[in-house]
């Protein structure tokens, strides 16, 4: 009875044995698309929690699940090999604001090279007016992070 109890107590530790955390330091560049004077570069440290089924990067969750409601669409992907991790998040929503049909789109793409300990992460945030047959970009924000992880 005691060996079974000990195995049951140790089982959670065995199932999380592939999980680990990284701290990545690098250069983050932010700017408004089409406005070169808005470019801002800072040194930043981000945390990453890696799991077999997904990862949390700077507060954002990446896995292979999708979520579709009447209000929004969220599609995520996460692929982990022994050498690399690639992940993506695509979020979109539509809203009627002051009689205009506004679409908000957020796209994140992450590449982590485990062997070289480096990361490249891009984030795009777009707000588009879809009221007329022509799309008008209201706001287009870009952010990229390139760094080294430990």
Regions found by a protein language model. Give the residues of each.
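Boundary at the C-terminal end of the N-terminal hydrophobic targeting segment
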Residues: 15-19
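Short, solvent-exposed loop/hinge segments that bridge or flank secondary-structure elements
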Residues: 23-62, 95-112
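Edge beta-strand at a domain terminus
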Residues: 123-150
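Conserved, charge-rich beta-strand/loop surface module that forms ligand/interface-binding patches
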Residues: 62-113
